[in-house]
C-alpha cells in the first residue's frame, strides 16, 4: 500500500454544507490520507460558484494533484460550474438518490437548504431542541439542581473528563435534556451521591478517564498545580469509579473516544431515543 499523501478536500453545498462535510469526512476516514479541508456553504449564486471553481483550480495549479470535491448542490447552474473545475467531484447525495428513485418509482423534488432548514413541518422539533439546549446550559457543571427530574440523563464525573461537551452535543444533535454534575477535590474525603440526586439514580451515567490523560488536560488549564498533578488525578478517578461500582451507575471511560462516540454510546446504553434534526 502506498504511504499517506496530503490531499486537499472541498465540502461544497448551496445549503449549510453539513451533509457534504459529514458524509465526505466519513468517506475520507476510510483512507490513510492526510487531508487539508475547506468547507464552503451557501454557494448559491453564479459569482460565488465561479470563485469556488477558481479556488479549486488554484490548488490544482499549485500542487498538480486534483482536489477532492464532495458536493451537495441542487441548483443546476451552480453544479455545472463546480463540475467544470479541476477537482475530482462527487455528488454525495445523488449517489443515494438514484437507486432510491428506482426502488420507490418516484422522482425526487430537490429543494436547496432542505436538510437543515426550518419549515412548518419541523418547527416544533426545532423548538424542542432549543429548549433542550437551554436546559442543558442551565444545568451545566452543577450550576442548578432545580428541575433535575426533567433531565433525560445526568452525567457525572471529575472535572475535565468531558461532561460539558458531551452534554451539549446530546442537546444540540439529539434534543436531549442533559444535566451534568461534577465531583471536585473537596468531595473526595467522603464521596457519596448528593441527596438531591439519589432519587434520580436511574438517569445517571458516569464518565471516567485515564489519570494520565486527565492530568495532561488539567495541566493546560492550571499549570503545575495540585489540581493537575498525576497523583491528584489518580486519586479522584479511583474514588469516582468506586462510587459508580457501589451505586451500580453505568459508566464509560472517555479517554479514547470522541464526543460524538461518547454521546452515541450514552444514548445506546441509557436507551434514549435518537431524534435527528
Curated annotation (Swiss-Prot):
Pfam families registered for this protein in UniProt: Kinase-PPPase
Keyword hit for Transferase: yes
Keywords: Kinase, Nucleotide-binding, Serine/threonine-protein kinase, Transferase
Catalytic activity of the protein: [pyruvate, water dikinase] + ADP = [pyruvate, water dikinase]-phosphate + AMP + H(+); [pyruvate, water dikinase]-phosphate + phosphate + H(+) = [pyruvate, water dikinase] + diphosphate
Annotated GO MF terms: ADP binding; ATP binding; phosphotransferase activity, phosphate group as acceptor; protein serine/threonine kinase activity
TM regions (residue ranges): none
Presence of keyword Kinase: yes
Residues the record lists as binding ADP: 157-164
Enzyme Commission number(s) of this protein: 2.7.11.33, 2.7.4.28
InterPro entries (UniProt xref): Kinase-pyrophosphorylase, PSRP
EC category name: transferase
HAMAP family xrefs: PSRP (MF_01062)
Family: Belongs to the pyruvate, phosphate/water dikinase regulatory protein family. PSRP subfamily.
Known function: Bifunctional serine/threonine kinase and phosphorylase involved in the regulation of the phosphoenolpyruvate synthase (PEPS) by catalyzing its phosphorylation/dephosphorylation.
Protein name: Putative phosphoenolpyruvate synthase regulatory protein
Record organism: Klebsiella pneumoniae (strain 342)
